[in-house]
Amino acid sequence: MTKLNLERTALVLVDMQNDFLHPEGAYGRNGQACDAIAQLPERLAPLAKAMRAAGGWIVSTHFTLVPSKKGAPFISPHLRSLRPFLGAGDFASGSFGHQLIDSLQPADLTVEKIAFSAFYQSRLEWVLSRAGLETLVFGGIVTNGGVASTVRDAHVRDFHNIVLSD
């Protein structure tokens, strides 16, 4: 088994945001909360704590809805059909809902994302490279969506990737 150089390793938390997970977030307010997903932060918290203690990094990627000049967010037709309850203020940069859930804070690096992959049209690759990170340990919600898309994009960028399971 290969030992990880934790100073070059990051726990990448995908979409672990209040709007997805907190009862007062967008999903909770609209009756879309999921008990299995709500339990995920408490399962990830010990790993995040251990990573910090061992000198590893915590990177948080945040799904972001960009508001139009009238305040309503730009939402793709596909997402609008799946999540018609999303509206102004949901997943807005700087808002309570956009933040990393308290039990996993603080993150060393935070990157906004507008698509499933956190690499798509974001600064993620740049900050990971500048931080000297080589190995990425992924955990988050919707493994077959944001997590898988980001892992695939990390792979083609030559990062060593580990996907957590429970």
Region locations from a protein language model:
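A generic structural signal for well-ordered alpha-helical segments
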Residues: M51-R52, L128, A154
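Internal catalytic-core helix/loop-beta-alpha segment
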Residues: D90-G140
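Glycine-centered short loops/turns at secondary-structure junctions
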Residues: A53-G55, G132, D158
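A short glycine-rich beta-strand->turn/loop micro-motif centered on a GG-aromatic cluster
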Residues: V137-G140, D158-D166
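Short Gly/Thr/Asp-enriched flexible loops that form oxyanion-binding sites at enzyme active sites
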Residues: V147-R157
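Hydrophobic/aromatic beta-strand patches that form the interior of the parallel beta-sheet core
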Residues: V12, V59-T61, L109-V111, V137, ...
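Active-site acidic carboxylates
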Residues: M1-P106
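Glycine-rich phosphate-binding loop at the start of an alpha helix
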Residues: S122, N144, A148
